[in-house]
């Protein structure tokens, strides 16, 4: 998924996972710049959390590689194997991900920009590229209304009292319009 930050790429991945009725494993690469992140991806000592253990435990059908444009090229080999062979291998486990939907999000706006910065070897492994266009004010308002309606429904389903208050929605609308 290509497009500006905040336009719904991650939410779309969550929605896909929800529609499939499965868990989603999310790796947010903006936070994966440390040695502990490297150990998480490629396998820590037995007993510690790792991506492979999480994939095994959750048997997820959706893997979200969020903000993939921020990944260190040192991680690419693991993803070549994942994309090419449908297998994720770390220091301790081998996990079949051939039936998983693997979604990468980036803040690149065009295919050319993504290929230039990610490099052809990794970019050519994506089977489909979807570009998210910038969201206009009307779209933001529509999204805010849907989120508000979802919140009301969720609270009502939990038998908690929430007074529907149009001033809340008006506040959201004002923030969106004024920035």
Stretches with model-predicted labels:
Residues 130-136, 140, 144, 154-179:
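Conserved AAA+ ATPase small/helical "lid" subdomain
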Residues 52-61:
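Short basic/glycine-enriched coil/helix segment immediately N-terminal to the Walker B
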Residues 23, 61-62:
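The start of beta-strands in P-loop NTPase/AAA+ ATPase cores
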Residues 47-51, 67-78, 83-139, 150-151:
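Canonical AAA+ ATPase core
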Residues 8-10, 34-38, 110-114, 138-142:
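Switch/connector loops and helix/strand junctions flanking conserved nucleotide-binding motifs
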Residues 27, 63-64, 102:
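Hydrophobic positions in the central parallel beta-sheet of the AAA+
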Residues 19-46:
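AAA+/P-loop NTPase substrate/partner-engagement loops
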Residues 1-27:
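Walker A/P-loop
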């Amino acid at each position: 998924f290509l497009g500006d930050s905040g336009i719904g790429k991650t939410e779309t991945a969550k929605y896909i996972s929800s529609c499939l009725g499965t868990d989603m494993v999310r790796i947010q690469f903006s936070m994966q710049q440390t040695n502990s992140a490297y150990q998480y991806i490629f396998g820590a000592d037995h007993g510690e959390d790792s991506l492979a253990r999480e994939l095994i435990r959750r048997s997820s059908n959706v893997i979200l590689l969020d903000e993939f444009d921020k990944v260190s090229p040192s991680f690419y080999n693991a993803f070549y194997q994942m994309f090419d062979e449908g297998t994720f291998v770390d220091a301790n486990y081998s996990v079949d991900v051939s039936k998983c939907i693997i979604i990468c999000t980036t803040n690149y706006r065009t295919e050319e920009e993504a290929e230039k910065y990610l490099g052809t070897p990794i970019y050519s492994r994506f089977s489909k590229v979807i570009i998210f266009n910038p969201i206009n004010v009307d779209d933001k308002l529509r999204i805010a209304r849907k989120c508000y309606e979802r919140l009301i429904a969720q609270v009502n389903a939990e038998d908690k009292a929430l007074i529907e208050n149009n001033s809340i929605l008006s506040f959201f609308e004002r923030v969106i319009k004024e920035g």
